[in-house]
């Protein structure tokens, strides 16, 4: 068994993936987008467990599973024994005992997956669909696929990530891998929402200092659900100070692209009429999510078969 297969028993954090593995997943995602097929004859079983609300991640994993011909075991948190006090560990232990091959999990607890993948009893593979404000590897991979399709490389690209940095698992996943891939990173947004850990990966700037220099301008959602109740900014003030206005859009380089992991607070992070503007790749990101998640599932299942 190769080192690559061993490492992909689970996909839980971008920190755990090598650059080679990341590039293979991106390129395989592009192959799936171009029509590659891989029907499974042994009917692997996948269960999606979402303990936080989701549209894009949840549904694109479902579409990816359908396209791969996998068997899906529906799991509804609201009608499960979780509501009787069952722990996440015991829930996954049960699904593993039932023969589920892969569990795709989103959970509010950061690093929830560590206990699961360390268990000698749980044999199901874990794909992290987002852990609180920790990591979001599949979102990061679809972002990378979108950038790679546009530019064909990462080395030397200037990438700005702007918005609610501290609460964003997308920012934390992307900053680590983009630096390893050779991109130059800039971070913008309210000072109240940026911790010192970002300084290890790039420069803190204002959006107006960097908007006309970047190749990729990535905005982040203001995550109201992870903030204390007292609002720091009104929507109007936030948009004026930190959002993509028409004036800022006009300053982007001709070849620059606009990204956002969504859901979008329109007229907060990005002006409503700019969400689908010519430089926007937001819809493409959503589309690419299906294909890169197909690549993730394929790689995890291949690793299981190799075992």
From Swiss-Prot:
GO terms for molecular function: amino acid binding; aspartate carbamoyltransferase activity. Pfam families: OTCace (PF00185), OTCace_N (PF02729). GO terms for cellular component: cytosol. Its EC number is 2.1.3.2. L-aspartate binds at residues 84, 169, 221. Keywords: Pyrimidine biosynthesis, Transferase. SUPFAM superfamilies: Aspartate/ornithine carbamoyltransferase. Coiled coil: none annotated. It catalyses: carbamoyl phosphate + L-aspartate = N-carbamoyl-L-aspartate + phosphate + H(+). Pathway: Pyrimidine metabolism; UMP biosynthesis via de novo pathway; (S)-dihydroorotate from bicarbonate: step 2/3. Carbamoyl phosphate binds at residues 56-57, 106, 136, 139, 262-263. Transmembrane segments: none annotated. GO terms for biological process: 'de novo' pyrimidine nucleobase biosynthetic process; 'de novo' UMP biosynthetic process; amino acid metabolic process. Belongs to the aspartate/ornithine carbamoyltransferase superfamily. ATCase family. Heterododecamer (2C3:3R2) of six catalytic PyrB chains organized as two trimers (C3), and six regulatory PyrI chains organized as three dimers (R2). Catalyzes the condensation of carbamoyl phosphate and aspartate to form carbamoyl aspartate and inorganic phosphate, the committed step in the de novo pyrimidine nucleotide biosynthesis pathway. This is Aspartate carbamoyltransferase catalytic subunit.
């Amino acid at each position: 068994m190769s080192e690559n297969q061993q490492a992909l028993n689970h996909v839980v954090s971008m920190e755990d993936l090598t650059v080679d593995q990341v590039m293979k997943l991106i390129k395989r995602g592009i192959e799936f987008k171009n029509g590659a097929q891989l029907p499974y004859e042994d009917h692997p079983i996948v269960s999606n467990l979402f303990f936080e609300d989701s549209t894009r991640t949840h549904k694109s994993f479902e579409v990816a599973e359908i396209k791969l011909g996998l068997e899906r075991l529906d799991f509804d948190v609201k009608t499960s024994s979780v509501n009787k006090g069952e722990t996440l560990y015991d829930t996954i232990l049960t699904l593993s005992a039932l023969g589920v091959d892969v569990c795709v999990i989103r959970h509010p607890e950061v690093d929830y997956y560590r206990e699961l993948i360390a268990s000698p009893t749980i044999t199901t593979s874990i794909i992290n669909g987002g852990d609180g404000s920790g990591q979001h590897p599949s979102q990061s991979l679809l972002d990378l696929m979108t950038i790679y399709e546009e530019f064909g490389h990462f080395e030397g690209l200037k990438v700005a990530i702007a918005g609610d940095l501290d609460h964003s698992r997308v920012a934390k996943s992307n900053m680590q891998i983009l630096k390893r891939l050779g991109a130059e990173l800039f971070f913008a947004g309210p000072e109240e929402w940026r911790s010192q850990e970002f300084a290890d990966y790039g420069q803190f700037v204002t959006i107006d200092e960097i908007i006309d220099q970047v190749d990729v301008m990535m905005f982040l959602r203001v995550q109201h659900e992870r903030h204390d109740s007292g609002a720091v900014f009104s929507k109007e003030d936030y948009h004026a100070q930190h959002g993509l206005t028409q004036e800022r859009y006009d300053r982007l380089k001709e070849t620059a692209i606009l990204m956002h992991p969504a859901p979008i607070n329109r007229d907060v992070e990005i002006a409503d009429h700019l969400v689908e503007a010519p430089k926007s790749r937001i819809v493409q990101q959503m589309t690419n999510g299906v294909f890169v998640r197909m690549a993730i599932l394929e790689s995890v299942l291949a690793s299981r078969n190799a075992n």
